[in-house]
């Protein structure tokens, strides 16, 4: 079920998975709307005006290809197919070319918003056959959420699989953001001794400032939620986090494109280790009497807020750097400022600071690492002492904060003008003759040393 508002256009729905779903939908939630339901695919296609626009909401993978093959015989040249699932961007690029050969226009549209977005409007990231954009723009922008200034959270991303790539990076940032919030909760609880009620109020207060976001807002709600017997539900949820794969895809693509993506990789790895519940319980038992906490300096809630904000900036810096690298690699010409604006509403990572991020990219010519933008570098400098203090405290307390630590180490590496990679390159040349550049030579000129002969 997707957004069912009072559209000016007619809508036809068809379900090929479970018989009767379309009928129940039309008679239920869609009652009174301009929506027709069909169980026969040929009748469904025949009911649409040309050029036909069909949006497919199916599981990523073979199901998309199968549906394309099923519906294509009933379509005509110039008809549009939109894949609104979480497809791999490489698959989308392949489908764009295959559909073009059939005379069809294929669009891969990343959609973020969850169940709420399905009813109230989502952030929609379309890409693929550019000729389809004038045809589908009114429909998708009507379906999309609207930012506070009324701008639809939907615009054209680029050719091939650009739309699904942007959605994949969105999900990677989402993984990072959620892990940072979880570590904040864990640190406040384990090292700070703050109960759920106080923590809920704290997140609620943060949601009134620069951390204002959907994820911070719902965290406040979750921490305050009690069951009928007065117990907090969050304390009764098993500490095992699931995932659907887009976070892993983003890390894999960052590796392939040579981008630093450590914070988001740690977020994925933490979900992985969370599933090893029995192993963790056994390890906790084995080491319980041996893990001694060191004396530590206390931290304030304000210092934790600074740590969360600075680390959040790193998550976005890594995500947008990956978008920038992909744009250059694939010739997509992604508009990073526009992407930031498009994520201001509907999507899971919507947050107040995206307006500032969009303005920073516009001022910076649309490229650059956001950690270097004046709008954010001043805030990072101010947060740095607290950031270091909070991470050090967590280490001394034995509280796992891998995303916070990764973010801080990324910052330290980014701001170090000479890293120990010179030794790594020397080792590579020693055992594999992989050559090296010299500090007293030209960039791009490589040397090899016969290390053994010098001994």
Kindly label every feature range from the protein language model.
Residues 9-53, 57-75, 94-102, 390:
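Conserved N-terminal Rossmann-fold NAD(P) cofactor-binding segment
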Residues 1-7, 11:
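Single conserved hydrophobic/aromatic residue that forms the stacking wall/gate
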Residues 381, 386-455:
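C-terminal amphipathic alpha-helical interaction region
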Residues 64-69, 82-83, 87-200, 208-236, ...:
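Rossmann-fold dinucleotide-binding core
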Residues 12, 37, 105-107, 261, ...:
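Hydrophobic beta-strand scaffold residues
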Residues 205-206, 328-362:
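Small-residue-rich helix-loop
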Residues 164, 189, 194-197, 201, ...:
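Interdomain hinge/lid region at the active-site interface
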Residues 79:
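Glycine-centered, small-residue-biased loops immediately flanking beta-strands
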């Amino acid at each position: 079920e997707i957004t069912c508002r009072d559209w000016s256009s007619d809508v036809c729905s068809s379900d090929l998975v479970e018989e009767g779903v379309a009928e129940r939908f039309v008679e239920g939630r869609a009652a009174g709307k301009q929506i027709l339901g069909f169980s026969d695919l040929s009748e469904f296609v025949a009911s649409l005006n040309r050029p036909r626009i069909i949006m497919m909401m199916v599981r990523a993978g073979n199901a998309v290809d199968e549906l394309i093959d099923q519906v294509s015989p009933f379509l005509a040249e110039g008809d549009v197919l939109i894949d609104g699932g979480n497809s791999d961007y490489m698959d989308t690029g392949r489908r764009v070319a295959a559909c073009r050969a059939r005379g069809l226009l294929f669009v891969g549209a990343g959609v973020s918003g969850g169940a709420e977005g399905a009813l109230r409007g989502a952030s929609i990231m379309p890409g693929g056959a550019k000729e389809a954009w004038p045809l589908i723009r009114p429909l998708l922008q009507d379906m999309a959420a609207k930012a506070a200034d009324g701008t639809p959270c939907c615009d054209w991303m680029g050719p091939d699989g650009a739309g699904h790539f942007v959605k994949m990076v969105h999900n990677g940032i989402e993984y990072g953001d959620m892990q940072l919030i979880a570590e904040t909760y864990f640190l406040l609880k384990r090292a700070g001794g703050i109960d759920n009620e106080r923590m809920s109020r704290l997140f609620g207060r943060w949601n009134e400032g620069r951390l204002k976001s959907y994820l911070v807002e719902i965290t406040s709600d979750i921490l305050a939620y009690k069951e009928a017997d007065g117990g907090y539900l969050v304390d009764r949820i098993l500490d095992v986090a699931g995932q659907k794969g887009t976070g892993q895809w983003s890390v894999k693509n960052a590796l392939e494109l040579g981008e630093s993506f450590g914070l988001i990789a740690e977020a994925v790895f933490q979900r992985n280790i969370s599933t090893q519940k029995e192993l963790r319980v056994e390890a906790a038992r084995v080491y319980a009497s041996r893990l001694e906490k060191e004396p530590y300096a206390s931290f304030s809630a304000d210092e934790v807020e600074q740590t969360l904000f600075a680390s959040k900036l790193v998550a976005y810096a890594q995500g947008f750097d990956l978008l920038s690298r992909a744009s250059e690699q694939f010739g997509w010409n992604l508009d990073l400022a526009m992407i930031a604006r498009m994520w201001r509403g509907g999507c899971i990572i919507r947050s107040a600071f995206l307006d500032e991020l969009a303005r920073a990219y516009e001022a910076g010519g649309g490229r650059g690492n956001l950690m270097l933008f004046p709008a954010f570098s001043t805030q990072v400098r101010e947060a740095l002492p607290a950031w270091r203090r909070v991470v050090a405290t967590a280490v001394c307390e034995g509280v796992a904060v891998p995303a916070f630590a990764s973010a801080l180490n990324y910052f330290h590496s980014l701001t170090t003008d000479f890293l120990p990679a010179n030794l790594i390159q020397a080792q590579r040349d020693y055992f594999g003759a992989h050559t090296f550049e010299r500090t007293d030579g030209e960039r791009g000129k490589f040397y090899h040393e016969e290390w053994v002969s010098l001994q």
